[in-house]
């Protein structure tokens, strides 16, 4: 019989992380998943958000306020005091514009933490700081970030502390794509629209959306 023996060393004063790390609890613990939305949002609000995720459409400002409040409470519970619209400009790296939940003290001098649906849905970073791929004149500075409801918000932990990161698309005032995500989202929408036509030819009348998957290699065969 062949035996193998594993030796490992734990520095004095250190903890054995194997005993303390619970992968099931750690996985997505810093992500505002659908499960967390379902727990924290009213049933009607959750249904509206889920419908827009699946079928597209615009989120009402009233619903966005409810989602923003729940997202803020969750972020604060995880130690965040700031939020950022997180996007991918044409620089090859991500960009962030940080804002605080802290607004102003109340009459009793207590700190008020606020986050509105308007702040969740839309931001306005200085687009002149980022390349546009020649789409517009260099002096045009206006740019907008818009919440991508299909991508979950998450907590990013750095040396300065946790921050709520809200995945967004980055566009110009005229709707020109200034990032790498907007063309991807538009391509997915166009592909879904045409794929549904094919699905209908095969007799499926219930499907409303087709989701592409991206990998190192993807193939399909039509028989």
Identify the meaning behind each predicted range.
Residues 18-31, 35-41, 201, 207-223:
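Active-site-facing alpha/beta catalytic cores
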Residues 141-223:
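Glycine-rich, acidic/polar active-site loops that bind/position phosphate-bearing ligands
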Residues 22-26, 44-49, 169-173, 193-194:
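Short amphipathic alpha-helical segments, especially helix-boundary/capping motifs
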Residues 25-140:
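Active-site core of metal-dependent hydrolases
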Residues 16-19, 83:
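Positively charged, low-complexity intrinsically disordered regions
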Residues 1-16:
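Short, Lys/Arg-enriched N-terminal segments with co-localized hydrophobic residues
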Residues 5, 23-29, 56, 149-152:
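Short, mixed-charge, low-aromatic patches
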Residues 10, 78-79, 215:
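Generic structural microfeature
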């Amino acid at each position: 019989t062949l035996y193998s023996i594993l030796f490992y060393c734990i520095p004095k004063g250190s903890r054995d992380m194997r005993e303390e790390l619970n992968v099931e609890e750690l996985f997505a613990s810093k992500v505002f998943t659908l499960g967390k939305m379902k727990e924290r949002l009213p049933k009607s609000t959750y249904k509206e958000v889920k419908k827009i995720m699946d079928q597209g459409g615009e989120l009402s400002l009233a619903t966005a306020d409810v989602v923003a409040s729940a997202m803020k409470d969750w972020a604060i519970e995880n130690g965040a005091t700031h939020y950022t619209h997180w996007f991918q400009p044409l620089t090859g790296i991500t960009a962030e514009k940080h804002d605080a939940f802290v607004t102003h003290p109340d009459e009793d001098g207590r700190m008020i933490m606020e986050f509105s649906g308007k702040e969740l849905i839309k931001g306005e970073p200085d687009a002149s700081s980022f390349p546009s791929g020649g789409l517009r004149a260099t002096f045009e500075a206006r740019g907008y970030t818009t919440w991508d409801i299909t991508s979950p918000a998450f907590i990013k932990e750095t040396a300065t502390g946790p921050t709520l990161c809200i995945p967004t698309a980055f566009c110009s005032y005229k709707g020109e794509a200034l990032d790498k995500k907007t063309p991807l989202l538009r391509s997915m929408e166009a592909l879904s629209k045409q794929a549904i036509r094919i699905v209908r030819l095969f007799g499926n009348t219930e499907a409303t959306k087709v989701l592409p998957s991206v990998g190192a290699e993807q193939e399909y065969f039509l028989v």
